[in-house]
Amino acid sequence: MNTLVIVLIAAVVLVAAYALYGRWLAKTWGIDPKAQTPAVKYNDGKDFVPANGGTGCSHQFSSLAGAGPVTGASQAAAFGWLPVLLWVLLGGVFFGAVTDFGALYASVKNDGKSMGMLIEKYIGKLGRKLFLLFCWLFCLIVIAAFADMVAGTFNAYTVVDGVTQLADAAQTNGAAGMVSIMFMVFAVVFGLVQKKLNLSGWKEAVLGILCIVASFAVGMNCPLIFGKATWSYITFVYIFFAAVLPMWLLKQPRDYMTTFMFICMIAGAVVGLLVAHPTMNLPVFTGFNNEKLGTMFPILFVTVACGAVSGFHSLVSSGTSSKTVENEKDMLKVGYGAMILESLLAVLALCVAGAAAAADGTPAAGTPFQIFSRGVAGFFEMFGVPNYAATVFMTMCVSALALTSLDAVARIARMSFQELFSVDDMAHAEPWRKLLCNTYFSTVLTLVLGYVLTKIGYSNIWPLFGSANQLLSALVLITLCVFLKVTGRSNKMLFPPLVIMLCVTFTALVQRLMAMVSAIQNAAAVTIPAGETTWGAVFIANGLQLIIAVLLIVLGATIVVNSMRSYVASKHNSEAKV
């Protein structure tokens, strides 16, 4: 099938969903353009910073568009491209976008409270504590997986027959790494200038584009040839500053600048597909069971992950984005619209992977990011862009996908950890509690543990990430059901996605747990750091994940039971009032 037809069908469905279903949700729940939002009410120049709809949407999309849409859609295509396309469209419209918009809506209507605080208000303190611990563990997994991927993307070395040598893509990877560093530097410059001059509209856009051009000009001419370990250190240093600095100084300007790159990347993919309109070489459907991945249920759903629905998105919506919404009318654009864009990105990634596959349906060699990067870079070359420039640009884009999620999740992890131990009267709290709630201490502790988990390796931790991510979305949906019920708003549209996600995620987690137990019992061979013994390697790759998986299952089940009790109680109270 022609990939152009697939993209056009997806675009029509997603745009129609935003215009019809998204607006219906906003009308059903109620939007008040005259209401004072938390960003305006509590503007502190750090976490609460008012931003217009465009900037808010760019922040949301940049934070959401991590490794998931590209990696998930490409990997899940092992079941065939049609099941992936259907789940991305249906999941994105009725599951993901609804969850993201709902989380943002609930937070804005509650003074910008994070999901943990919302759970305390509508479900109880125990539910909040359990949820915050769940979120923090989940964030550790995300930090480890994405940081390992970023460091690997910029790595200029490879090992051949036990000998470390420069990789063929050393210059390209090194240039992309330097561009990324300069991107951070110029993001701070952008933030300072924006803060002083209060630019908007085309002036703000021009400044952002100039900063992007400057970053590429320096980076492409001064590549940094470092190994993976060095890039890992650099990545974690960046994450630290992104987690503690004011939003306006680094994260917001970086997200704004990154959005321009994403637009160029998506435009390049779309125009390339329009001009070349390559054939979708991947099979339509391969069966309900895949030898490598497992059964379609639940693996397809947790593998596609962020392209259809993601619990992480809700943490961004309630943790950072709700504190930047300047007007309630922007919530639809920020919450529902950004997710629609991410679903479109997943469709593009699927089509690029399909075009890169061999005529007999054999997938292209390389990781999903490498396949996507090479494919879109090839489209840019069609328009006269030099191969080196196109490859550096796309390498930077795919790494930015992970970095924008990394800085968001690091801030969310820090805030979740602080909320976990905070009390109302922190001025008279115990010294140990003050230490744990200290911004710098909580950030360092989180990042150190995240760094330790990178030793597991991105490929080993991804399956657990997908399952935990989807379970998080189910927990958020339960909270939203209670919130909407208590506040007298309709919540019926949340029941189908809630039930389906609970079934999918608990099944996937149990399957993953059983697989890890089996691997440990059999001392199975796994991809491990050099120098580890077999049993030590099995524990690193499976034992630590087993511990986290058990904790996630127990925490998730406890939160579900606790939330259901609260929902029944709130329903009875509501009926009693009537």
Where are these regions (language model features)?
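Membrane-helix boundary/coupling elements in multi-pass transport proteins
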Residues: 67-74, 91-99, 103, 107-111, ...
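Flexible loop linkers connecting adjacent transmembrane helices
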Residues: 23-49, 72-75, 85, 89, ...
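Membrane-interface "cap" regions at the ends of multi-pass membrane proteins
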Residues: 16-70, 259, 295, 299
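Extracellular loop-to-transmembrane helix junctions
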Residues: 2-19, 76-107, 116, 175-187, ...
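Loop-to-transmembrane helix boundary motifs in multi-pass membrane proteins
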Residues: 125-140, 337-343, 390, 419-455
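Membrane-interface loop-to-helix entry segments
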Residues: 16-30, 134, 174-218, 228-275, ...
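Transmembrane helix-loop junctions in multi-pass membrane proteins
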Residues: 2, 70, 82, 141-166, ...
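Extracellular/periplasmic helix-exit of transmembrane alpha-helices
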Residues: 101, 273-287, 340-375
